[in-house]
Amino acid sequence: MPRLSAIATGGGGCFIVRVRVLIIGCGYVGLPLGVQLLRQGHAVFGLRRSAEGAAIVQRAGLQPIVADVTRPGDLAGLPLPFDWIANTISSGKGGAPAYQKVYFDGTRNLLRRLADSPPQKFIHTGSTSVYGQADASEVVETSPAEPASPTGRILLASEQLLLDAFHEKQFPAVLLRVAAIYGPGRGHHLLQYLKGVAEIPGQGERFLNMIHLDDVVGAIIAALQNGRPGEIYNLADDEPVPQIVFFRWLSATLGRPMPPFVPESAAVSAGRRGDTNKRVVNRKLKTELGYSFRYPTFRQGCAAEIQRLKEASLL
């Protein structure tokens, strides 16, 4: 089965390298990623756990695979080899037990299945929740990763499986630590505000680290193309923002009142990413991978989402 192939794009002798790509967990992030890669001329396979999910993948024009990474037997049927693999899987709900099965056990199962037929690049999407800093400090990829939550510790252990595989067997893993994703139908603080149930913990000084879905997709593609195996990259936009600033902007933009202030311990939004307070730095993503953000801050991204909702008569 061929892996790399070239596609002629005209008489000028220009060629695009066509690769076989597998997207694991082809859902909120993985599906638009697959569509974008398909538009670039690649052969894209999307893995989902159910036949219903696979049907969504097929309707998007991708080649569906039904398998569950928590079941080693399911992975035996993967049509290996692939040039690129992007693991964008989500645990859904279920807390730490689900994280253990999907992220840690799933990663271990994938490494075992790919041992004899590794890809040229393997992208793992984790979370900035592995950073437990609570002092509003800046965090870069080399900052201490001491998660404050059980799920954060599981995510860190899953990363370590991949780093060990890189150091011991040169497995081409690139690790992405993704901030809170927002976009169509997603974005905890934005959606809470639009529903009228948002609350501001304390004085609203805790920082939010966010990234728009479109930029997650773009950054993953940049990592597939240029990411260095064994390296970690933070995926967050240019502006970590205090909650008070975020909600003031929404209030002014929409002409709605500010959310109420509540004690930190009673906040509805508390605990989404542990009791952390940090400013995630994306410098390495931009300088090393050359990524340019479509939505550099929450202002551009939330404005686009608000406009989308208005055009759909949902706001």
PLM-predicted stretches and their roles:
Residues 191-211:
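A conserved pocket-lining segment of Rossmann-fold NAD(P)-dependent short-chain dehydrogenase/reductase
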Residues 297-315:
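Amphipathic terminal alpha-helices
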Residues 248, 267-292:
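Conserved C-terminal active-site "lid" loop/helix of NAD(P)H-dependent oxidoreductases
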Residues 219-220, 226-270, 315:
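Mid/C-terminal beta-alpha module of Rossmann-like enzyme folds, strongest
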Residues 156, 168-171, 181-191, 201, ...:
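Glycine/proline-rich active-site loop of Rossmann-fold NAD(P)-dependent oxidoreductases
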Residues 81-123:
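NAD(P)-cofactor binding segment of oxidoreductase domains
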Residues 135-175:
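Catalytic helix-loop patch of NAD(P)-dependent Rossmann-fold dehydrogenases
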Residues 109-150:
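Conserved Rossmann-fold NAD(P)-dependent oxidoreductase catalytic core, especially the SDR/UDP-sugar
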